[in-house]
Design a protein with these regions (language model features):
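A short SAM/SAH-binding and catalytic strip from SAM-dependent methyltransferases
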Residues: 125-136
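A short acidic, Gly/Pro-enriched loop at the edge of an enzyme's catalytic core
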Residues: 114-125
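A short glycine-rich, Lys/Arg-flanked "PGG" loop and its adjoining helix->strand segment in the class I
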Residues: 139-151
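A C-terminal cap/extension of S-adenosyl-L-methionine-dependent methyltransferases
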Residues: 216-220, 230-300
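Conserved class I S-adenosyl-L-methionine
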Residues: 1-54, 68-72, 154-189
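Class I SAM-dependent methyltransferase SAM/SAH-binding core
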Residues: 60-115
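Acceptor-substrate binding/catalytic loop of class I
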Residues: 201-217
């Protein structure tokens, strides 16, 4: 059994992994800064906040990565000024390049979420996407979020893995792994080699995710930090199963051998099932069953 990493080791692994991944991260995860990305991000925010969705004068993003959340919110006019932080300088470098290409002005700072170098009550909005599950001490981090938030301000974190939803997602992953040789023969693809996309950080990928959450556990971090109006909702069920099936299959093949027709099918199918999840399932099923959780809270 691999011994548990210390908090400092988790931070170090996350820094190294994301520094190496930064150059091809957007391509790997299909991150978009056009109309599609903007509509996806604004849909998450409006789903979580309802009519109280801004615009926000000054936002702080934790674990900004390459800018998916903040840059799309700025393009949509929901955020006016933004500070983007990440433990990875490499990610922030890619974010800055993306912002320059989009004509957006953002501040960036490499820092740890558990010890933010900002004055009290500095921001109207504290946000993040797929970041909380990387942070060793979430209690300390949420106390920092509360400290730097102005009274009446909002906390919003999306894309956090649900413990039960993550277990369910292992089923399509296992099925896809078993079916991969047949799938590769059908599309005439060679098996992937160790040199295919992402090899430099592959050895660290299994170490960077340190949490999966139940809705109650995620809520407790916000409440213990004296935040109010705490709400957790779930998103993506069918779309997630479909997406993980396709990602698992594609990871077994040479990238250049995966035909455009397949990628188009996977892309359009994912969007279609996102719509099914959003319109039919998310309001009817408990949050814990979904793959992703969104948490919102406010500072009194």
């Amino acid at each position: 059994m691999t011994p548990a990493l210390s908090a400092e080791e988790i931070r170090d692994v996350n820094t190294r992994y994301h520094d190496v991944a930064a150059d091809h991260y957007d391509a790997k995860w299909g991150i978009d800064f056009g109309d599609l990305g903007q509509s996806q991000v604004t849909a998450k925010v409006r789903k979580a906040l309802g009519r109280n969705d801004g615009p926000f004068a000054r936002s702080l993003e934790i674990g900004s990565g390459t800018g998916y959340f903040t840059l799309n919110l700025m393009r949509a006019g929901l955020v006016e000024k933004a500070m983007c932080t990440d433990i990875s300088p490499g990610m922030l470098s890619t974010l800055s390049a993306n912002a320059q290409r989009l004509g957006l002005d953002v501040e960036t700072l490499a820092t740890d979420a558990e010890s933010l170098p900002f004055e009290d009550e500095s921001f109207d909005l504290v946000i993040g996407h797929a970041i909380l599950h990387h942070i060793p001490d979430l209690g300390r981090a949420f106390r920092e979020f509360e400290r730097v938030l102005r009274p009446g301000g909002t906390v919003l974190f999306a894309g956090e893995p649900s413990r039960y939803g993550d277990r369910i997602a292992n089923v399509p992953k296992r099925v896809a792994t078993a079916a991969a040789p047949i799938w590769r023969r059908a599309i005439k693809a060679r098996p992937a080699s160790p040199a295919d996309g992402g090899a430099p950080e592959a050895s660290l990928e299994g170490l960077v995710d340190v949490h999966a959450f139940s809705p109650g556990e995620l809520s407790s971090f916000a409440r213990e930090a004296d935040l109010e109006d705490v709400k957790v909702i779930g998103e993506e069920l069918l779309a997630n199963w479909f997406g993980w099936t396709n990602r698992t299959l594609e990871a077994t093949a040479h990238p250049e051998d995966v035909p455009w027709g397949w990628r188009n099918y996977a892309y359009k199918g994912y969007l279609a099932l996102q719509k099914v999840d959003r319109t039919l399932l998310e309001s009817r099923l408990p949050p814990a069953i979904f793959y992703n959780l969104i948490i919102t809270a406010s500072k009194p």
